[in-house]
Amino acid sequence: RQMCIRDNRSPSDIVLEVSSTMAPGDHPGGFAGACWAFTNADSLRFYRDNDFVAEFAPDRRGRFAALPHPPIEIHDFVGLLLEKYEGLDRAAAPQVAAILNEMRRDAMELSPLSRARMYSLRLSWNELLQLYYKYIGVLGSPSAVYRFEAVWHGRAVRTVVKEPVQSVRLECTVHNPILTDGPTWDCAAVSLRAIDQNGNLLPYCGEAVQLSVEGPLRILGPSVVPLRGGMAGTYLATTGEAGPARLRCRMEGALDTEASLTIRRREEERG
């Protein structure tokens, strides 16, 4: 008897992380290699400069088949773009796209089969390189805007955009914004991240963050913390008084950010 399993998830339960920064300079020799999407969605749509490239689904028979949500490999970076912009027919376009994707995956190396296809399509190496520079890209070539959409029940519910950094923002997250001071002091962990205009972590940002507090609060540790891998952290502790408090964070190259906390007072119980 066939069983029907109901999906009780909501759009807020869907996650999406992309393994690659899509920046050639982040990879050896400028060759990006494999790109994976980690998501619990049904499929993934991939766009380049607002042009739809392809849609990918989890491989449930591959090497990650034992996982409830196998990562999705993004293996086609050309898709239908050759038909749209180069005028190639439906027979030739997929073959040329396969050659370009192989060049991306294998650092410009071509298998004997791909070389045979190249000659049968009457493509010169220079013509192939021009297509590679245009649709895949190398160090120094114009950067594209890549968009990844996690598709769940037929609609996009999560989006990740990878593009050159245009602005830097300091993100401050207080993991326990309501503290209770009583017989002992209470404490909150704070996470700091340097992110770009799309919310992507900037792992090469190593600026120092200056911290200051207002209200019944004190910083546990130094008031200046350096970012490592684009991230840092600190701890805040109560001082024995109640009231509103505020943490201010300042970093060169980004707007100041702040976080609000509430300190409550619980009198020590008498025996």
Segments the model singles out, each with a brief description of its role:
Residues 1-5:
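Short, small-residue-biased leader/transition segments that mark boundaries at the very start
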Residues 6-36, 42-271:
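The feature marks long extracellular or luminal low-complexity segments
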